[in-house]
């Protein structure tokens, strides 16, 4: 029974970490999300090692199934938010590249006092 309680507690820790990661992704705190991800991955690895030998009780399996379902839902939402961020960063890189090309083009004309995007 103590092993089962320990396993349940490990899954709860993973769920708590995934909820924290989801919150960080929701508020776009990407640096903290990356930092927390290492802790999350270690917890998943440790729990996987425990789970292999411990999961025999049907009641425990159902409790773990519920936690896993929530963890997976959080993972899906985190990935969606990360993809949205990646798309936004790609758009910004594209805009920056286009702006640099325009500035280089207009910078070739010596009579141009200002480059596009500059103010007097």
Curated annotation (Swiss-Prot):
It comes from the Bacteria. Pfam families: FliT. GO terms for cellular component: cytosol. InterPro entries: FliT. Residues 1-50 are annotated as: Required for homodimerization. One of its GO terms (biological process) is protein folding. It is found in: Cytoplasm, Cytosol. Keywords: Bacterial flagellum biogenesis, Chaperone, Cytoplasm, Repressor, Transcription, Transcription regulation. Its main location: cytoplasm. Residues 60-98 are annotated as: FliD binding. Belongs to the FliT family. NCBIfam families: PRK10548.1 (NF007836). Dual-function protein that regulates the transcription of class 2 flagellar operons and that also acts as an export chaperone for the filament-capping protein FliD. As a transcriptional regulator, acts as an anti-FlhDC factor; it directly binds FlhC, thus inhibiting the binding of the FlhC/FlhD complex to class 2 promoters, resulting in decreased expression of class 2 flagellar operons. As a chaperone, effects FliD transition to the membrane by preventing its premature polymerization, and by directing it to the export apparatus. Homodimer. Interacts with FliD and FlhC. This is Flagellar protein FliT. It comes from Yersinia pestis.
């Amino acid at each position: 029974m103590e092993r089962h309680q320990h396993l349940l507690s490990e899954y709860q820790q993973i769920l708590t970490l995934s909820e924290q990661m989801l919150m960080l992704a929701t508020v776009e705190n990407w640096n903290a999300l990356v930092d927390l991800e290492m802790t999350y991955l270690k917890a998943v690895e440790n729990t996987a090692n425990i789970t292999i030998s411990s999961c025999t009780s049907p009641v425990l399996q159902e409790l773990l199934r519920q936690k896993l379902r929530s963890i997976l839902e959080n993972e899906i939402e985190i990935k969606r938010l990360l993809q949205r961020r990646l798309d936004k960063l790609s758009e910004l890189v594209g805009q920056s590249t286009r702006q640099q090309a325009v500035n280089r083009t207009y910078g070739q004309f010596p009579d141009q006092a200002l480059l596009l995007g500059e103010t007097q």
